[in-house]
Amino acid sequence: RRHWTNVLTRYTVGVGGAAVIGAITLIFAYLLWVVAPILLPAEIAAPTEYRVVERPAALVDVSENGEAMVRISETGIVEFFSVADGSGIAAYDLGSTIVKAKRLSPLVDTYALLDNNNNLLFVKTDYIVDFDGGQRRLSPKLSFPFSNRSIPLGPLDNFDVQLADDDLVIATVRGSQVSLTRFKNVEIGYRLSGSAQVTLASTVQAQEVFLGPRNQWIYLLSKSGEIDVLGIKSLQRVSRLYQGSLAPKGSTITAVTPVLGRYSLLTANDQGDIVQWGALVNANETRFVALRSFDVEQSVAQLITEPRRKGFLSVANDGELSLLYPTSGRLLDQRPSNLPASAPMAISPRSNLLIAAPNDGLITAHSLDNKHPEISWSALWTEVWYEGYEEPIFSWQSSSADNDFEPKFSLTPLAFGTMKAAFYALLFAVPIALMGAIYTAYFMAPAMRALVKPGIEIMAALPTVILGFLGGLWLAPIIEANLSSVLSIFVFLPLLLFAFALAWSLLPEKIVHSTSGWYGLIVTPLILGSVYLAFQFGPFFENTFFGGNSRAWFLEVLGLSYDQRNALVVGIIMGLAVIPTIFSIAEDAVYAVPTHLVRGSLALGATPWQTLVKVVLLTASPGIFSAVMIGMGRAVGETMIVLMATGNTPLMDFNIFEGMRTFAANIAVELPESEVDSSHYRILFLAALVLFLFTFVLNTVAEVVRQRLRRRYGSL
């Protein structure tokens, strides 16, 4: 019977251990499986060609769902084709000759068409899905969003048009003359009315004109790279914001286009350089700085931007296609092609298809596999120069209310916040837990130990959400209102304890020995008294040393700003959560030191303190080290306390009076709201993988060190 019991126990333990290892392996495999797609390279696929009716194209585009293509020809014919086989679906005749066509930014289904009489007409495409005999059918429709009346513009060299909220602006340029027409309270389906017009003189002979963000700026550029930026928030008070050059001396601008949101411009020159220029606006001036550059090694003839992301595609003079993304600074893929450099092209709204009309009777489609262009090693871990910022920064900001928002996916602030929270928690917890464990196991009276040890261990059962709640809503306001008093505790407590210890040593030997092991209970009133004195004298210290306002003093003298929910609160509250773990393991390690070692040391003449330092702590060092490492793992992975007791702001500042955002808290907050399989979703899983690997490596190193300590001191 004993044999079968041993066999059953052995296999049960073995299966349990294998299950734990298997679970850890599965967790790692699943995290890696979710993260893996962001490591795959982007690709421009080989083209698919469609033979269609020969007509010169002014514009080509793709429907939202990628099932239909539209070609607006110079003869005024609007045709729809199937992406699957290139077959014609529908056609409409506008009855006019089109010389130039553009998307009505930021819409992806509305276009501004300029005819040969310089009249501007807006058209809108709709795709209706119905079922005929059980078969799905796509029916394209062409409509006029602002009525079928065209808008006369007069002589012009180029134009741009943009709809921002309910504000429609049309800008035309002819030489150095700029004309602006603004329509207010614009709604799709209603006729345009109530226009305001103004004509301005520019300082450059502009060949390109682009409206800026929210129709508040206008960019005017010449072929030589000269730029004139005007503020047009009010047509009655137009101001010049910037005047300068966006091209190296001796070079010529060959292509220019705004990036989504229009806070920056992309320029390509005849030397093969593509530069992203960002506008920096402050109260005193507006500047344009080169945020980043790309070298495609040959002259670029055309730049095609993505409708809903910051990415773009360049077309070289020999037809080579280059797929790039500014934020990550990556040249994603290149592919040679036979496309004419000036052929009308467009990237689909979902950025998965490139459509081109290389000649009158042909349409080509390149499939784009480019799901995560914003992710790169540099974008995740190094400083990135984002639009509108004075310099490269570390930043995590995954979402915004604006569709033209530039996501910021730097993991560095989250890693920094994780280490910051763990550091301050351990700074508070480790000394208290270890000293308490050593005293409880070695010096404390057995009767008192029987009460103290279970009492501290039961603290581990407290839900961290309760601790976080208390920290954020109770402790944080108290510390904010009594900062000087809280800091005074760290002065009063050690001074009073030292004075008490000195006085206690002067008492008769009989009293000292009779109370041995009960010192923890004896000094408890002293500890409470020191806290009381600190709060009583806190205002005095604040007036004497901090000029009556400690928070203002820290900011003005030390440059440390103060937030109510900060690392100090996290250190205290998370320390309370970590202390039971460290205390319990360390106390068991110290208490388990064989008594014959202690008695032998004392018998050889060592004092109890010498025995503790030279024998007990060395023998217990593997367990003490394990306690600290397990406590650190608990602090690194803590979620609810950090989430509730800090501002949860991803800062790169070690200031104890400011908060942070950690990996765990960030995952808890953002994962439920992220779109499945999006870049944001996969980066959150990458953060989980980084946290998993960190704790795995930490525990592995801790185990190696523990084993070495055990071999070294186990023979004492």
Segments from the language model and where they lie:
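Transmembrane alpha-helices
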Residues: 583-585, 593, 608-643
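C-terminal transmembrane helix and the adjacent membrane-cytosol boundary/short C-terminal tail
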Residues: 499-508, 587, 591, 595, ...
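Interhelical loop and adjacent transmembrane-helix boundary motif
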Residues: 556-560, 642-692
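Loop-to-helix entry region at the N-terminal start of transmembrane alpha-helices
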Residues: 408-422, 476-495, 511-581
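Transmembrane-helix boundary motif in ABC transporter permease subunits
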Residues: 425-456, 500-507, 702-711
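Structural motif
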Residues: 75-81, 117-124, 175-184, 224-231, ...
